[in-house]
Amino acid sequence: MAHNIIYGHGIIIFLKNVNVFPIFLQMALWRPSDSTVYLPPPSVARVVSTDDYVSRTSIFYHAGSSRLLTVGNPYFRVVPNGAGNKQAVPKVSAYQYRVFRVALPDPNKFGLPDSTIYNPETQRLVWACVGMEIGRGQPLGIGLSGHPFYNKLDDTESAHAATAVITQDVRDNVSVDYKQTQLCILGCVPAIGEHWAKGTLCKPAQLQPGDCPPLELKNTIIEDGDMVDTGYGAMDFSTLQDTKCEVPLDICQSICKYPDYLQMSADPYGDSMFFCLRREQLFARHFWNRAGVMGDTVPTDLYIKGTSANMRETPGSCVYSPSPSGSIITSDSQLFNKPYWLHKAQGHNNGICWHNQLFVTVVDTTRSTNLTLCASTQNPVPSTYDPTKFKQYSRHVEEYDLQFIFQLCTITLTAEVMSYIHSMNSSILENWNFGVPPPPTTSLVDTYRFVQSVAVTCQKDTTPPEKQDPYDKLKFWTVDLKEKFSSDLDQYPLGRKFLVQAGLRRRPTIGPRKRPAASTSTASTASRPAKRVRIRSKK
């Protein structure tokens, strides 16, 4: 006997006393996933090392500058009365960047000892810097900087009653010894610095007088004469400190820059920093606070008010500032006057000098002695000392000497290499007299037959645009080495060090020469002398 059960659109039959198990099958239904779908990242242009397309030769050259000297006032530039912007004495401080722009000769126009080194039809020559030595003259010394009206309120290092209300000028004449810095950055483009500057508020908010300005981190090229970080921070003091007395004279209206090592290390082509040498040290010598109205009021839940009897009813100035100090200076910690060899750069550019130039950024505060000069206002010099009859002057002097070892390299101009160099820097190919054809155009161009006829408009020849120097408006100390290359490495101190380091020997040019030893084959075939034979006489 069977039982019928209606289910949905069908009929299911069950048999009595029979073991039957119905199975219900449901068709699968596809639904889109609710989870986020991540696409693969887009492909990026691959940056290759210069070692992949630059072939190095066995030809090396030495190039060096003459003695480089500079003299000036360590705190400010001296402008004579009525001279306008003309400066009589420039500002020369040990706490300035010295950025040397080294100009090299064009190797493709260079007189080479062997003309078969490269094929000018398919190859180009470039320089690679493999060695460098920065010589520094003058003795080690410490130079002070300060301000005759320095904003120093209380000595917060020792116990002192807090000065709550300041109603008069309490500035003092203070001098400090700055942070100690030794720095050297080598690259084929200028180094990049960073500093904090005054930013802008989002509209419609407006900055009211007395409000704290917003800060913005800016990146700029480090130029010759820019101030380094002296221990007061990398910032624009001219726009962020209106009192002009929070820091010493030489930086109160200047911008102190700090090298942006993060950005230069992340440079995809590695042109701004082949390598760098850095040594910094400082400690806090004195602890002071600043005079003025506190812009940020101390929350009342952070302290318990005192009484007026002990002058602690209201808190005093809580803007604290130390005086930096660079501590002891020794010759054991010197980074200069020693050679450095470049085997592998930190970036993709392994020392190739694009555009035949180098940028050397140097800081050395271990030779910051300021010379004191005094001149009598009377002639002859008074026999009795009177300070009003003598004028005091301060000068700072610096002495440099740059030495380099360059290696001659070749680049085979294949289509792939030229396309890569064009994407990296198209001006390199332009300097090699390679041009990129303009894109095709569909517009008609008018061409007159009689160009000199007065019946038609004047056909002026368009002058080709002049090549613009991208660093024309920037300040650098230019060092021209175009006529100072020499292949006689043994005639220069750095060249002799390079020969020893590279394991190379030079041929003797004078003196007797040893005879060449006989070859093995000649010695084996040569006749040997006969042995002596003794003949005894018969008795």
UniProtKB/Swiss-Prot annotation:
Protein's UniProt name: Major capsid protein L1
Subcellular location: Virion; Host nucleus
Oligomer status and interactors: Self-assembles into homopentamers. The capsid has an icosahedral symmetry and consists of 72 capsomers, with each capsomer being a pentamer of L1. Interacts with the minor capsid protein L2; this interaction is necessary for viral genome encapsidation. Interacts with protein E2; this interaction enhances E2-dependent replication and transcription activation.
Family per record: Belongs to the papillomaviridae L1 protein family.
Any one Gene Ontology cellular component term annotated for this protein: T=7 icosahedral viral capsid
InterPro entries, A to Z: Capsid_L1_Papillomavir (IPR002210), Capsid_L1_sf_Papillomavir (IPR036973), dsDNA_vir_gr_I_capsid (IPR011222)
Residue ranges, compositional bias (Low complexity): 517-528
Any Pfam family matching the protein: Late_protein_L1
Species whose genome carries this gene: Human papillomavirus 45
UniProt lineage: Viruses, Monodnaviria, Shotokuvirae, Cossaviricota, Papovaviricetes
GO terms assigned for molecular function: structural molecule activity
